[in-house]
Amino acid sequence: MSIFLNKGFSMPTRETLGGKLSCFIGRHLALRNKNTFIDKSALISPKALINPRCGEIKIGKKCLICHGAIVQGNVTMGENCSVQPYSIIVGYGSPTDKLGEIRIGSNVRIASHVMLVGANHIFKDRDKPICTQSVERKSIVIEDDVWIAGRVNIMCGVTIGKGSVIAAGAVVTKDVPPYSVVGGVPAKIIKER
């Protein structure tokens, strides 16, 4: 399977990734990692980072990942989705352990500077540094036909219902019912569509 890349595409080096590279660059991107599945109609723009780490990445038909976007870990994306510049989508777990994964349905629009991370740091023990207390993993689910506006943060464990709109700058800490418009910090339902 090969995917055409825009002129100017660059990949991190082994040193900047801190481990094995999952792809090799030539005229086309040749995916070598058995845990990365990108449909041939998907477009991966220059300077996007796609890295399954220990997980599995699946990107469906006609998806667009723009420059500066990061998709890593356990992430599944349906068809006809877009991830705009500088958005970060980080799933946790492995191909067999889905706790902490990010599941994105079809026809989802993710604007610039959106953050979805399937884990959060534990910081209950004051006698231990936070960085030694591990993370709590919870999956994030974005159902079909959702629009996530710019600079939104969706916390781990949240499900965004079908047809919902998340207003710019929102911090989503709770599940969003289908066909809802939410906004604010923390996000609250503004109206139904």
Question: Positions of the model-derived regions?
Answer:
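An amphipathic, basic-hydrophobic alpha-helix
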Residues: 25-34, 46, 67, 85
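Short alpha-helical
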Residues: 77, 160, 171
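Terminal amphipathic alpha-helical/low-complexity segments used for targeting or macromolecular assembly
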Residues: 1-35, 40-41, 107-109, 113-114, ...
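Flexible, glycine/small-residue-enriched loop-and-beta-strand segment within the central core
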Residues: 48-59, 65-156, 185, 193
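A generic "structured core" feature
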Residues: 165-171
